C-alpha cells in the first residue's frame, strides 16, 4: 500500500451488450506507478499456480493508441469486499492507466473501461454531468452519480441499497439522475443531494 494514492473511485456502468450484468471497476490513485507496477508484476509472477486454469496471468488490453498489461491476480474476495455490488467472483483483474490502478472482477469490464477512457468517452463535458457537478461542492469525501433508469433495470443485487421510497416510486424516479455528495468537516458529515 506504500504506492497507493489518496482516492478510490468505484464505477458501475452498462456494458455494450445490455443483456449482460453491469460492469464494475475500482480506480485507485497511485503515487509511483513504475514502482507499483513492478511490485504487482512480482506478486503475480510469484503467486502459486491456479489448479486447472489455463488462462495466462498477464495478458493485454489493446486500444488504438496502446497495449496495456492486464494482470490476473490470485483468487481473492477483495473486490467483492470493497464494492459489494458485483456477483460473487474470486477473480480480480488489474491494469494501470493514467496514474491509476484499475481493478475489476472480469477482464471484459476492465478492457471496456480502458477503451472508453482511451477514446475520451467520459462524463466530463456531458451536459447532465456538468449540470449536476455545478451544484455540488468542489471538496468532498464521497460522491455518487446514478441514472435511476439504469439502476432500476439492474438485478436485485445491485438495487438492494436503494431506499424503499425510490423503489416504490420507480416510475417517477427513473426519469432522474441522482447526485449525492458527502463532505466531512470537524467530524460532522454534511450531505448534499441534487
Task: Show the residue positions of the predicted features.
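Signature of soluble extracytoplasmic/periplasmic domains of secreted precursors
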Residues: 1-194
Amino acid at each position: 500500500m506504500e504506492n497507493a494514492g489518496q482516492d478510490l473511485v468505484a464505477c458501475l456502468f452498462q456494458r455494450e451488450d445490455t443483456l449482460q450484468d453491469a460492469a464494475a471497476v475500482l480506480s485507485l490513485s497511485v503515487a509511483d506507478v513504475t514502482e507499483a507496477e513492478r511490485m504487482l508484476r512480482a506478486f503475480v509472477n510469484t503467486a502459486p499456480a491456479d489448479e486447472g486454469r489455463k488462462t495466462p496471468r498477464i495478458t493485454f488490453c489493446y486500444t488504438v493508441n496502446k497495449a496495456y498489461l492486464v494482470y490476473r491476480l490470485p483468487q481473492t474476495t477483495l473486490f467483492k469486499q470493497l464494492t459489494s455490488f458485483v456477483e460473487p467472483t474470486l477473480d480480480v483483474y488489474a491494469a494501470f492507466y493514467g496514474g491509476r490502478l484499475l481493478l475489476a472482477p472480469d477482464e471484459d469490464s476492465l478492457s471496456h473501461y480502458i477503451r472508453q477512457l482511451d477514446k475520451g468517452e467520459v462524463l466530463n463535458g456531458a451536459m447532465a454531468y456538468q449540470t449536476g457537478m455545478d451544484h455540488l461542492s468542489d471538496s468532498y469525501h464521497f460522491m455518487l452519480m446514478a441514472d435511476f433508469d439504469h439502476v432500476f433495470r439492474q438485478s436485485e443485487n445491485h438495487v438492494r441499497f436503494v431506499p424503499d421510497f425510490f423503489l416504490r416510486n420507480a416510475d417517477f424516479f427513473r426519469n432522474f439522475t441522482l447526485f449525492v455528495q458527502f463532505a466531512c468537516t470537524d467530524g460532522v458529515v454534511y450531505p448534499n443531494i441534487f
